[in-house]
Amino acid sequence: MHGTMHDMRTAARSLVRAPRFTAVALLTLSVAIAVNAAMFTFVTAVFLRPLPYASPEQLRDVNIDALEGRAFVAPRIRQVTGVLAPQGGVAPYTERGFVVSQTGPAAEGPPIFVPGAGADDRLFGVLGVIPALGRAFTAADIVPGAAPTVVLSDRFWRVSLASGPAVIGSTIRIEGREHLVIGIMAPRFAFPDFAEIWVAQPMADARFGETRVLFRGRAGNAETAAQALEAALGASGSEAHVRMTDLLPRGGALLAALLGAICFVLLIACSNVANLVLARGTGRRQEIALRAALGASRGALVRYLSMEGLLIALGASVLGTLGSVWMGDLIVAAIPSDGLPVWFEMQLDPSVLGYIGALTAITVLISAALPAFTVTRGRLATVMNEAGSRSTGDRSSTRLRASFVGAQVALAMVLITGAALLLRAFRSMNDVDPGYAADSVVELRARHAGLPGGDDFLRAALDRLSGVAGITAVAATAAGPAGRAVPTSDAERAVAPVTLAVSAGFFEALGLPLVAGEAFEPGREQVGVAVISESAADLMFGGASSAIGATFAFDGDSAELTWRVIGVARDRRRPSIGGRGIERQRYVYVPITAALAGEVQLLARVDRADPLSTASASMAALRDLDPDVVLRTPRMMGDVERDLAGNVRFFASVFTAFGAVALGLAALGIWGVVSYTVSRRTREIGLRIALGATPTRVVREVAVDMLRPATIGLACGSLGGIAMGRLLRGVLFAVGAADPASLVFVVLVFGGVTLLSAWLPARRAARIDPLAALRSG
């Protein structure tokens, strides 16, 4: 112990006497550890930390796939709960938003839109949670005629109600009705992820497609329950595929790629510092030889040399831990506020601290212990002879330096290849033509506590918007009945297209042309007519020409309720990631008077250079029309379409940032090794120049020694880049895992950076003054 403490004090004094080396090594490792710790904290918070429910691993979301095979659309919540109840707990719920008014202490201010859920008395019990204040729903809250009740989230209570202590037993107005507040949930609770209020709601009449089902199974019986439900649905004439999915998001291969990327950054940083330590140790071989001559064993020498690396690693861990908090804030700030669930929390828990401890151990092993073992190799006489010369050290040190350079190049190549693939995929997704004038259309979502989809509100809203300067066409849309299937030309198959209720002028405002037939006419009552998309026409009637004048009915409707096709619109298109190409969306458009709309999407075609200023004027016009209308932030439809590439954009940003850091570290490593080689071979190079070597030859010989391991690193990195592409397949679009263009681009860029990093110090070698070099030797 005394020897260890003595070595530690000696190492500390040595580091103080070499401030540049200490600062560079400390900064390099601190940044790498901070990046690793911040990303691991984020990954832990999103993917690994248990959800705020009792035994969350037992919970499953029941998904009934009605898009393929015989579509399942009948309102059978009771049947599903009846089948699943013997297998475990089951609770239906409806994820939706609510218009809430009179929330302030003085009941002032406009109504607000609040995400939430409709639930009955089973939901909180199946989740295994109880309110922090008050109570949960009971059967008495669900019976017909019961007083409306609501449970609030902790955040809604604190932000919207200012943590009023008397909130339990008070009322707030939701969707135009007074609701009694009966409970407040714990701070981190949310289900679904973004819900802030839960309204008591009977589920007996809910439709699939509008309502989801939560299931708490017993150990390993989720598949059995799914099979039993499929069998029951099939026996009742509704074929469907039932999937039980975990509530916790799974990263899979993408998570492995992300964790691999941050580890690569650390390994590159460790390789860089190891090269610095190795160069520093080689320059101290005379000191090492003297200690060995005085009786120090190799183990004692390794311990002595490793102490410097240990102190640097410990210091970098402390700085990296502090820096990870700041980097974590940057990561969270880069994600939209509505992109993270309520239960998300970045914190340095024991798992993160353990991860940082493991990083420290890896850092010490690579950047300190390995160079120390290498420097102390060899016999004493050999070490003494080398110590008295200006050589670059023994062959093992040279090989290890070259290996570190090759490893840095290979790891950086993998990261940059991943970034190139993701950037190409992101660009390809943004280049997809959506089929309409998305960048010229502003979307405003309006909701009212009364009847926002009523004719009076719509007519007045559209009239007001038409008078706003810069708007050339307006229309309104609302979601139609969800999960409603229609027959196809194949009698054995049905599909469930997206049903939209639209106003007259919708296709003009959206810039979505018709390929056959006509659109809905303004000022004319149209009942029982529909416009369908090209892909829907192909499936339902075998083509657009056959669709005009044909009739169809939604499953579950009476035989008398049919729809006549009067037009066929161009398909709306969007990219489908994971190598599935461009998705042609199937739509059925019906007149908006034929649907009950909970939220209206107002669309305005604009021709001004600043469309968002037009949107602001539009919002003012609507609020002037009705102060109680709730408006969401206006957006360009082009931005809405581009949001589909959100995951790709996130991974592309992460890999680009990591790739840039890795490229810089690798270039710095090559430059440092070549610079060190030049400094140790000054006398030799001066002698060669004195004997007639040309500057070009000197540059070539100095640089080639480093280009060999770099070339091997490029080859290995190319293979690793292909493997990384395979891990990223889940977020790639129109780009293969082994995309030749991306690989060639990365090789050329990295090859150029490698040449430049080696050429700059090699050029300095060619300018050495032979006489000065020989005198210094």
Briefly describe each language-model feature range:
Residues 1-23, 243-248, 276-303, 307, ...:
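Alpha-helical transmembrane segments of integral membrane proteins
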Residues 18-46, 50, 268-271, 313-317, ...:
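Short, strongly hydrophobic transmembrane alpha-helices
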Residues 31-58, 327-335, 411-440, 675, ...:
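Alpha-helical transmembrane segments
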Residues 39-42, 274, 310-383, 424, ...:
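Small-residue-rich transmembrane alpha-helices
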Residues 48-99, 212-216, 429-487:
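Membrane-proximal extracellular/periplasmic loop immediately following the first transmembrane helix
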Residues 269-313, 669-710, 714, 764, ...:
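Interfacial "coupling" helices/loops that link adjacent transmembrane helices in transporter permeases
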